[in-house]
UniProtKB/Swiss-Prot annotation:
A motif (Cell attachment site) lies at residues 201-203. It comes from the Eukaryota. It comes from Bos taurus (Bovine). Residues 51-65 have a biased composition (Basic and acidic residues). This is Conglutinin. Disulfide bonds join 275-369, 347-361. InterPro entries: C-type_lectin-like (IPR001304), C-type_lectin-like/link_sf (IPR016186), C-type_lectin_CS (IPR018378), Ca-dependent_lectin (IPR051077), Collagen (IPR008160), CTDL_fold (IPR016187), Surfac_D-trimer (IPR015097). Residues 139-148 have a biased composition (Gly residues). GO terms for molecular function: D-mannose binding. Oligomeric complex of 4 set of homotrimers. The gene is CGN1. The modification 4-hydroxyproline is found at residues 78, 96, 108, 111, 129, 132, 147, 153, 171, 195.
Length: 371
């Protein structure tokens, strides 16, 4: 602190020349010991002094700590959009990625158009018998059926017990005179005549037939034979019926009737001939139960079938093949109408719903026979 005032005083009392030298010397002395710059404010501007010697470079001090960052400046305005650059070259094809998960199932599509009708398949094997259907309502009393054909003779039955003698029947009406019978047995001897001449010895006669038993036993035996004959006929008819049915596959049984089909499709006349050769006739349902049995066969075969009835003899009057009028019918609404573009409809078909319709007899329909 004392050095500074003394320096000022020396400068003021010394001549300029010596002052400059002394200052130089003093400055050298001062600068040799410390890097201190002395600033003097002259009272008047003197002559410029000589250039002083370059001072030694002082060593740099340690770098100070960085100052705290200043506040962020405001964001500048976005620049203009540059022009679109040229399209780059295509890159190399990458490897296939992994298979993705299966997507959800789409909604079902619209039904396609119906395909053409395929050819008829082969006849399948006979299926197992179905469960018996419910008992149908009692139908109206049927007409008298046609006489059946003569059946095969059945086996001889066991000898039955002797029946009770029957009552004497009323005398029958006198029959027509029959042909001359054989020579009867010798009559009773007449009155003794006069003795004749002795004749030759005759040949021995044949043994006569055994005489009949009493009248009551004969009547009882006849009654017994009549009963056995009735049983035999029923047995023969049933045996013949089942024998014919077995030879004709795929059928339904209702009461004493059996309906069968072989799956054949024919005209009415050919269908009649086929059933006739099988010793049967076309299906003739006479009750709702029989009609239902035929309907089930129509559904199973998926084909309409012929029935036996027709009005070929009298238009509008449908009858059975025997000529009897119908005792049961199940016509569809508005049928029979005899309308097929001018072609007469004299025959009957049955639909899968059991309803009947009149059709031309030339139509090809399923054949169902009745036994």
């Amino acid at each position: 602190m004392l050095l500074l005032p003394l320096s000022v005083l020396l400068l003021l009392t010394q001549p300029w020349r010596s002052l400059g030298a002394e200052m130089t010397t003093f400055s050298q002395k001062i600068l040799a010991n410390a890097c201190t710059l002395v600033m003097c404010s002259p009272l008047e501007s003197g002559l410029p002094g000589h250039d002083g010697q370059d001072g030694r470079e002082c060593p740099h001090g340690e770098k100070g700590d960085p100052g705290s960052p200043g506040p962020a400046g405001r964001a500048g305005r976005p620049g203009w959009v540059g022009p679109i650059g040229p399209k780059g070259d295509n890159g190399f094809v990458g490897e296939p990625g992994p298979k993705g998960d299966t997507g959800p199932r789409g909604p079902p599509g619209m039904p396609g158009p119906a395909g053409r009708e395929g050819p008829s398949g082969k006849q399948g094997s006979m299926g197992p018998p179905g469960t018996p259907g419910p008992k149908g309502e009692t139908g109206p009393k049927g007409g008298v059926g046609a006489p059946g054909i003569q059946g095969f003779p059945g086996p001889s039955g066991l000898k039955g017990e002797k029946g009770a003698p029957g009552e004497t029947g009323a005398p029958g009406r006198a029959g027509v005179t029959g042909p001359s019978g054989a020579i009867g047995p010798q009559g009773p001897s007449g009155a003794r005549g006069p003795p004749g001449l002795k004749g030759d010895r005759g040949d021995p006669g044949e043994t006569g037939a055994k005489g009949e038993s009493g009248l009551a036993e004969v009547n009882a035996l006849k009654q017994r034979v009549t009963i056995l004959d009735g049983h035999l006929r029923r047995f023969q008819n049933a045996f013949s019926q089942y024998k014919k049915a077995v030879l004709f596959p795929d059928g339904q049984a209702v009461g004493e009737k059996i309906f069968k089909t072989a799956g054949a499709v024919k005209s009415y006349s050919d269908a009649e001939q086929l059933c006739r050769e099988a010793k049967g006739q076309l299906a003739s349902p006479r009750s709702s139960a029989e009609n239902e049995a035929v309907t089930q066969m129509v559904r199973a075969q998926e084909k309409n079938a012929y029935l036996s009835m027709n009005d070929i003899s009298t238009e509008g009057r449908f009858t059975y093949p025997t000529g009897e009028i119908l005792v049961y019918s199940n016509w569809a609404d508005g049928e029979p109408n005899n309308s097929d573009e001018g072609q007469p409809e004299n025959c009957v078909e049955i639909f899968p719903d059991g309803k009947w319709n009149d059709v031309p007899c030339s139509k090809q329909l399923l054949v169902i026979c009745e036994f």
